[in-house]
């Protein structure tokens, strides 16, 4: 019997698929082959949550528990790894996962060293980003319900064990019963205790009951909460009740803060900090190339290899030639804050030092002191002092506050000179809200606050107003930079460039840039007015 052409093609295709399937199975399951999925060995730890991890109070540890594997599997194991899916051969139409092992970018000795330094940076990041409001607090059973006051967090669409739940009933009862109600998630248990009745597993309303109080409390240690609604930053206020008593507590639903870490630099011999590896100097220039070159020359006297980033919106730009200068050009008159954004966007170091283009470094411009402050405190930004030719030095320490106004009128901004308190461990340094235009800051925090490019002519304190409440600011009066003299002797020739600069830099009270700034503050920050001392 002869096969027609279609049947023959189908038979050939079937045999080819079968051969590929057998080849795939044999290579995947062949004994003695190295496992292609294992990229690296993660830090040794328990491969999964075991019974000891679920027994938080020793007094209930003797009560047996039947673990619910499907629920325990939803909990964070704190032992992640990255594995590819599939075998050696990439088969068509099959979705596969590709894993990348970042540790392969280092040799063994370098990996050990960089892992230690990364952990040190991470712990410093946690110390800066966490507060007392994040700590877990358990309310004692005064009601007689014990429950967490704060500090319970779950990632969106993830599950956690809920800590601290307990019933401390003084009177003997036939049945001890508690109830949990959520609105944005569901309840379950990671294990079942014999003698405890559960109603509502996998639902938003869970009831637990038992004639034996210890067994009920052992079961409460195994209660899990699962986020069921994707909201990146919210909270579920849940209710926990027993007969005659009800309490409420909050479960935060959010992603943990994602660190932005910078590798620590090696220290040159005899130096406290490698400034060139830690700091980039950033400035915005407009027309004043003589002042800019003087600034660069003064920096090179003390920091020969530090990178300098320049944002330039001059009409006829002049290129600055220096092996460690990055010069970026902008449209003419683009603006003061737009230039700041451009300069900061190109910084790759942990810290950025902001300076005006007419500053001059001296022996008192000790960047090491400012770096030391940021390395050893949770501050995000620390300013220095600017010394005028008269010898007077200013730190421009400013306190900012916003007072609520009447409905519909907007709030009132209060600005006054001063500081909140001294910075412990650093003489001549204080904590404040705003500082002079000479400061060292964490690069990621400056980018987070940003400079509003709508402020294009005159602006400074507006940056600190944008950062009020999120930017931790300090000031040290003993780190000083000089300000080039603005005094013009009458017998010297006029500088057309300086006159043009002055027209842009010092607009009158009725200039449209000032009006635009006031309109912006009115709407953006919902302000009706401000006072300044």
Swiss-Prot record:
Its EC number is 2.4.1.92, 2.4.1.-. Glycans are attached at residues 79, 274. It is found in: Golgi apparatus membrane. Strongly expressed in brain, testis, spleen, and to a lesser extent in liver. Pfam families: Glycos_transf_2 (PF00535). Pathway: Sphingolipid metabolism. Disulfide bonds join 429-476. GO terms for cellular component: Golgi apparatus; Golgi membrane. Residues 26-533 are lumenal. It is a single-pass type II membrane protein. InterPro entries: Glyco_trans_2-like, GM2_synthase, Nucleotide-diphossugar_trans. Coiled coil: none annotated. Keywords: Disulfide bond, Glycoprotein, Glycosyltransferase, Golgi apparatus, Lipid metabolism, Membrane, Signal-anchor, Sphingolipid metabolism, Transferase, Transmembrane, Transmembrane helix. The chain crosses the membrane at residues 8-25. It is an enzyme of class 2 (transferase). It catalyses: a ganglioside GM3 (d18:1(4E)) + UDP-N-acetyl-alpha-D-galactosamine = a ganglioside GM2 (d18:1(4E)) + UDP + H(+); a ganglioside GD3 (d18:1(4E)) + UDP-N-acetyl-alpha-D-galactosamine = a ganglioside GD2 (d18:1(4E)) + UDP + H(+); a ganglioside GM3 + UDP-N-acetyl-alpha-D-galactosamine = a ganglioside GM2 + UDP + H(+); a ganglioside GD3 + UDP-N-acetyl-alpha-D-galactosamine = a ganglioside GD2 + UDP + H(+). GO terms for biological process: determination of adult lifespan; ganglioside biosynthetic process; glycosphingolipid biosynthetic process; glycosphingolipid metabolic process; limb development; lipid glycosylation; lipid storage; motor behavior. Residues 1-7 are cytoplasmic. Involved in the biosynthesis of gangliosides GM2, GD2, GT2 and GA2 from GM3, GD3, GT3 and GA3, respectively. Homodimer; disulfide-linked. Belongs to the glycosyltransferase 2 family. This is Beta-1,4 N-acetylgalactosaminyltransferase 1. It comes from Rattus norvegicus.
């Amino acid at each position: 019997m002869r096969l027609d052409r279609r049947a023959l093609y189908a038979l050939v295709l079937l045999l080819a698929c079968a051969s590929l399937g057998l080849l795939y199975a044999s290579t995947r399951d062949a004994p003695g082959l190295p496992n292609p999925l294992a990229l690296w060995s993660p830090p040794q730890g328990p491969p999964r949550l075991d019974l000891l991890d679920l027994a938080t109070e020793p007094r209930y540890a003797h009560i047996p528990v039947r673990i619910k594997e499907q629920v325990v599997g939803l909990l964070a194991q704190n032992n992640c790894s990255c594995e590819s899916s599939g075998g050696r051969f990439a088969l068509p139409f099959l979705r596969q996962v590709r894993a990348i092992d970042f540790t392969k970018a280092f040799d063994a000795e370098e990996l050990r060293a960089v892992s230690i330094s990364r952990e040190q940076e991470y712990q410093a990041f946690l110390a800066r980003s966490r507060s007392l409001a994040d700590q877990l607090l358990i309310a004692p059973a005064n009601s007689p319900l014990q429950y967490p006051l704060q500090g319970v967090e779950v990632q969106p669409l993830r599950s956690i064990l809920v800590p601290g739940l307990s019933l401390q009933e003084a009177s003997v009862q036939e049945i001890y019963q508690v109830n949990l109600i959520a609105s944005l998630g569901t309840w379950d248990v990671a294990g079942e205790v014999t003698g405890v009745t559960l109603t509502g597993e996998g639902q938003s309303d869970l009831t637990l009951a038992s004639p034996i109080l210890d067994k009920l409390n052992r079961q409460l240690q195994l209660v899990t909460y699962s986020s069921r609604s994707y909201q990146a930053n919210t909270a579920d206020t849940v209710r926990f009740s027993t007969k005659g008593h009800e309490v409420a507590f909050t479960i935060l639903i959010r992603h943990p803060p994602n660190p932005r870490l910078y590798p620590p630099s090696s220290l040159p011999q005899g130096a406290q900090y490698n400034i060139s590896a830690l700091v980039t100097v950033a400035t915005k220039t407009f027309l004043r190339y003589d002042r800019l070159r003087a600034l660069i020359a003064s920096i090179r006297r003390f920091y020969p290899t530090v990178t300098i980033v320049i944002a330039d919106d001059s009409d006829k730009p002049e290129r600055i030639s220096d092996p460690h200068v990055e010069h970026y050009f902008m449209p003419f008159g683009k603006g003061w804050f737009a230039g700041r954004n451009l300069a900061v966007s190109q910084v790759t170091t942990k810290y950025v030092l902001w300076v005006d283009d007419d500053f001059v470094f001296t022996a008192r411009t000790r960047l090491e002191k400012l770096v030391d402050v940021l390395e050893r405190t949770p501050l995000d930004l620390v300013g220095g002092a600017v010394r005028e030719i008269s010898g007077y030095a200013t730190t421009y320490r400013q306190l900012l506050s916003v007072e609520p106004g009447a409905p519909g009128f907007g709030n009132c901004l209060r600005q006054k000179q001063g500081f909140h308190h001294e910075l412990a461990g650093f003489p001549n340094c204080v904590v404040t809200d705003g500082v002079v235009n000479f400061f060292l800051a964490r690069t990621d925090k400056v980018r987070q606050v940003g400079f509003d490019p709508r402020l294009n002519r005159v602006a400074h304190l507006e940056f600190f107003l944008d950062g009020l409440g999120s930017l931790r600011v300090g000031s040290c009066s003993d780190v000083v930079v000089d300000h080039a003299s603005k005094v013009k002797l009458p017998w010297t020739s006029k500088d057309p460039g300086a006159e043009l600069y002055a027209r842009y830099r010092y607009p009158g009270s009725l200039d449209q840039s000032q009006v635009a700034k006031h309109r912006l503050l009115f709407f953006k920050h919902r302000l009706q007015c401000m006072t300044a001392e």
